[in-house]
Amino acid sequence: METTTRKQKKALETKKPSIYSLQLHEMQEWLKEQGEPKFRAGQIFDWLYKKRVKNYEDMTNLSKGLREKLSNSFDITTLNTLVKQTSSDGTIKFLFQLYDGYSIETVLMRHEYGNSICVTTQVGCRIGCTFCASTLGGLKRNLEAGEIVAQVVEVQRALDETNERVSSLVVMGIGEPFDNYDHLMSFLRIVNHEKGINIGARHMTVSTSGIIPKIYKFAEEDLQINFAISLHAPNTELRSKLMPINRAYKLPDLMEAIKYYINRTGRRVTFEYGLFGGENDQVEHAEELAQLLKGVKCHVNLIPVNYVPERDYVRTPREQIFLFEKTLKNRGVNVTIRREQGHDIDAACGQLRAKERKEETR
């Protein structure tokens, strides 16, 4: 439920910090303050991320006193699974309930090269993209780092049943990751750490709608993480129509920030381009996009959009998608069409949560 204001207030009053929010060095510092040896941090991380226990009593190589200190200081964040949808292609979409009653989505996608998870960083979104279900209802709050980490842990628990593992992740779920920058960075470092979830940096991707100051900041981070931009239009006028954020952060300035990122890191960026029938999917749009990206070290990911009942956009015909791709290739752009997954479930970002919220208000 997302209307239980009294319940949310009470939850905030009784909530302890999530232990999943602590990076290893922060855990070591806390242990030092408690008069405990710092090597215990590695043991605690092993229980949390390798054995994935749900309570401190199971941490049997820790003293009873330390377990009590942990229990008094931190919650082991658990997410209540409200809905679990499984697609015919193996994609699984989870609707998780948080401690305060809000709900978020997490998606498990199966590929030939392994299992990938798409995580959420906010409850709702303020960006207001006109094609996205995530922004319906606006932004409620940011997720803590531990709540983002908990999504990976919960999905990994589900995979434990079939002896599988999460091998890669994308930060492309509900919300704008760079609007929750500090918690995002803590999350990335926890899941990347060898004593944490241990997902390689080059197997992680962060996507942004284009918050320019944070792009410059992200360029200075010492992380080899893949970077993606939600572009969706080849010019300022059309992008402002599809994505209101473009009115604050103009496309020319965005491109300058992206070029800075590329020069600073030496890494290629991915441009996500959703195709909306009759809006941005014509040959002239492809030609304009090729011109915009000329000389930019990048890859374009064309996305056949999922239908969202609350939005007016329609899917681009299959033959038009291939023509758009061909036009870009002929002009030297590195481009692929994203494989559709979860097409027979509520796969569009924010769609399952929006559906649940609608049912609650009936």
Curated annotation (Swiss-Prot):
GO CC, any one term: cytoplasm
Protein EC: 2.1.1.192
Location in the cell: Cytoplasm
Example GO BP: tRNA methylation
PROSITE patterns: RADICAL_SAM (PS51918)
Coiled coil (UniProt feature): none
UniProt entry keywords in alphabetical sequence: 4Fe-4S, Cytoplasm, Disulfide bond, Iron, Iron-sulfur, Metal-binding, Methyltransferase, rRNA processing, S-adenosyl-L-methionine, Transferase, tRNA processing
Miscellaneous remark of the record: Reaction proceeds by a ping-pong mechanism involving intermediate methylation of a conserved cysteine residue.
Family the entry assigns: Belongs to the radical SAM superfamily. RlmN family.
The name this protein goes by in its record: Probable dual-specificity RNA methyltransferase RlmN
Organism field: Bacillus cytotoxicus (strain DSM 22905 / CIP 110041 / 391-98 / NVH 391-98)
Lineage of the organism: Bacteria, Bacillati, Bacillota, Bacilli, Bacillales
